[in-house]
């Protein structure tokens, strides 16, 4: 294979040219090609120092790209799984408007208030699976104060 001779830094740059990765994701992807853990950490430290890789940038980009479709709880969980620390997650999600996102997702999927308890449960589950907090879901399903939002 022609790619066997590439350095760790070149492999990482190739990955990072496509999308942002967290340090943990890069460790997982590059570990099979590293001779030692120290070599891998040195290469990743160099990438972070030259600002090629940044967990902060990943978190902001991730929150921005997925924020309209998912709630802050799901976004935070996915970022934690990818190795982003809690402070970075909190900062990236600080501008997240769960209510507006939940309303938009609800409007796309359902568009009208539930007629019975079974339909309400179905709509509640839909929003909960997308990581929206319970108080936000209750606001969306109650109709809230936004009268022109609920059109027939």
From Swiss-Prot:
- Tell me where the signal peptide lies: none
Q: Does the keyword Acyltransferase apply?
A: no
Tell me if Cytoplasm is a UniProt keyword of this record: yes
Query: Which InterPro entries would you find in this protein's record?
Result: RecX_HTH_2nd, RecX_HTH_3rd, Regulatory_RecX, WH-like_DNA-bd_sf
Q: Name one GO cellular component term.
A: cytoplasm
> What GO biological process, any one, is recorded here?
regulation of DNA repair
The record's subcellular location field reads:
Cytoplasm
The superkingdom listed in its UniProt entry is Bacteria
Which of UniProt's keywords are assigned here?
A: Cytoplasm
Family the entry assigns: Belongs to the RecX family.
Briefly state the protein's biological role: Modulates RecA activity.
The name this protein goes by in its record:
Regulatory protein RecX
């Amino acid at each position: 294979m022609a790619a066997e001779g590439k350095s760790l830094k070149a492999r990482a740059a190739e990955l990072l040219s496509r999308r942002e990765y967290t340090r943990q994701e890069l460790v997982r992807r590059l570990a099979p090609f590293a001779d030692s853990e120290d070599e891998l950490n040195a290469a990743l430290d160099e990438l972070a120092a030259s600002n090629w890789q940044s967990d902060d940038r990943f978190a902001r980009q991730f929150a921005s790209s997925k924020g309209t479709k998912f709630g802050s709880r799901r976004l935070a969980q996915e970022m934690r799984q990818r190795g982003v620390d809690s402070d970075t997650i909190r900062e990236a999600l600080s501008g997240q408007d769960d209510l507006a996102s939940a309303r938009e997702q609800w409007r796309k999927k359902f568009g009208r208030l539930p007629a019975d308890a079974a339909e309400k449960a179905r709509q509640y589950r839909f929003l909960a699976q997308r990581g929206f907090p319970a108080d936000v879901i209750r606001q969306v399903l109650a109709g809230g104060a936004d009268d022109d939002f609920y059109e027939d």
